[in-house]
């Protein structure tokens, strides 16, 4: 029986439940094992409590043998690889950002000064560029908590990853889903990262779940992030799509006040994923990314 380590939130257990089902389809018995992380109990902004706060506890639980497999939202993982583990990317969910607003409103329809909840610098900077009049409020908590702030009237809208809404069964709550070229998502958004200790039976099992296109796309996107030496809380975005067998990678660096948006793009074969990510980051540096990031 393989134990799958997961955070206890609805989204996390739903995601890990999918991994459990996929492993069972491959002939492996698996069960979920809840691991409490510091990020689940500390409601301070992620920028303050540290990159990887949601993932480190899961990795340590695997390392000490409490469970054999860890399931992460790939966008939450630090960019540096952890050499203890094999990492597999299964088939990817929707990469887009979603708005959940009162009265079915879209971003353009929100009234002047509307209160919008998000703590992600990447989202804040793009929101300010599109709607500088908005009152952007900090937001933490699970999906239910975040959506509840709109239902209660505390906020007029919140921004969330559409993939999380879909996985948790709340897709219909989205009042607007943004084209990734209009509102750029986090690198590896919509993708899961499944880890197991190298050389173990669990590592063999998760290898069966690997998806080639998702692996190449997320590698390119996360290379943009790592080359910029920016963490998962920086105002950096990356997305990609396929044009035939060509992978098209776009990256963005944004000033937190919305005053500057740097965008770069590269395309090539899946085998060149890392090179594409480096090419995008090189172009962003040429446009002044270092100055924009230093100012944050």
Swiss-Prot record:
Pfam families for this protein: Porphobil_deam, Porphobil_deamC
Ribonucleoprotein is among the record's keywords: no
Organism superkingdom: Bacteria
Oligomer status and interactors: Monomer.
One Gene Ontology molecular-function label: hydroxymethylbilane synthase activity
Family: Belongs to the HMBS family.
Protein name per UniProt: Porphobilinogen deaminase
PANTHER family: PORPHOBILINOGEN DEAMINASE
Function recorded in the entry: Tetrapolymerization of the monopyrrole PBG into the hydroxymethylbilane pre-uroporphyrinogen in several discrete steps.
Pathway listed: Porphyrin-containing compound metabolism; protoporphyrin-IX biosynthesis; coproporphyrinogen-III from 5-aminolevulinate: step 2/4
Class in the EC hierarchy, top level: transferase
Cofactor binding description: Binds 1 dipyrromethane group covalently.
Cofactors (names): dipyrromethane
Organism annotation: Corynebacterium aurimucosum (strain ATCC 700975 / DSM 44827 / CIP 107346 / CN-1) (Corynebacterium nigricans)
Entry-annotated residues carrying S-(dipyrrolylmethanemethyl)cysteine: 232
Keywords: Porphyrin biosynthesis, Transferase
One term under GO cellular component: cytoplasm
More info: The porphobilinogen subunits are added to the dipyrromethane group.
